[in-house]
UniProtKB/Swiss-Prot annotation:
Its main location: membrane. GO terms for molecular function: G protein activity; GDP binding; GTP binding; GTPase activity. The gene is kras. Transmembrane segments: none annotated. Alternates between an inactive form bound to GDP and an active form bound to GTP. Activated by a guanine nucleotide-exchange factor (GEF) and inactivated by a GTPase-activating protein (GAP). It comes from Xenopus laevis. SMART domains: RAB (SM00175), RAS (SM00173), RHO (SM00174). This is GTPase KRas. Its EC number is 3.6.5.2. NCBIfam families: small_GTP (TIGR00231).
């Protein structure tokens, strides 16, 4: 069974834990309890393949930012979460993405942009803004509500699909490099 290491990142209070707990335990946690770091595991079937999701729910608080490099090194894919009623959390996505790329030393890291709290009426981040940002990054965008469960499975499953595509691409690139080495002739 394939295991996928997923990391949920985003600013404080955007609903990272609520999304993760909704996926794992099928219920909404409405009291806010800031996370330092929690790990969850769940077996799921995605596109006919049984797989194990190893999900790291991270701290949004700036005082825990030193821990980020460590979990970013081990993560295979990242849910970059903002709250649709918090423009600052949306603006912070750029910093998380840059840190992930720096730590992974790659421009091509599997990510999904997630706009959480879409059931709330007080939207400050327009859907088109988020779609445009995701398009500029070349990553999928999904709106979610941890409260109603809307888009929750879709967000995590889409990230797994992005990781699969990335692994496929990397193995094809590796094969191309190997093939080109065998075609070299020295005269």
């Amino acid at each position: 069974m394939t295991e996928y290491k997923l990391v949920v990142v985003g600013a404080v209070g955007v609903g990272k834990s609520a999304l993760t707990i909704q996926l794992i335990q099928n219920h909404f946690v409405d009291e806010y309890d800031p996370t330092i770091e929690d790990s969850y595991r769940k077996q799921v079937v995605i596109d006919g393949e049984t797989c194990l999701l190893d999900i790291l729910d991270t701290a949004g608080q700036e005082e825990y930012s030193a821990m980020r490099d460590q979990y970013m090194r081990t993560g295979e894919g990242f849910l970059c979460v903002f709250a649709i009623n918090n423009i600052k959390s949306f603006e912070d996505i750029h910093h998380y993405r840059e840190q992930i790329k720096r730590v992974k030393d790659s421009e091509d890291v599997p990510m999904v942009l997630v706009g959480n709290k879409c059931a709330l009426p007080s939207r400050t981040v327009d859907t088109k803004q988020a779609q445009d940002l995701a398009r500029s990054y070349g990553i999928p965008f999904i709106e979610t509500s941890a409260k109603t469960r809307q888009g929750v499975d879709d967000a995590f499953y889409t990230l797994v699909r992005e990781i699969r595509k990335h692994k496929e691409k990397m193995s094809k690139d590796g094969k191309k490099k190997k093939k080109s080495k065998t075609k070299c002739s020295i005269l």
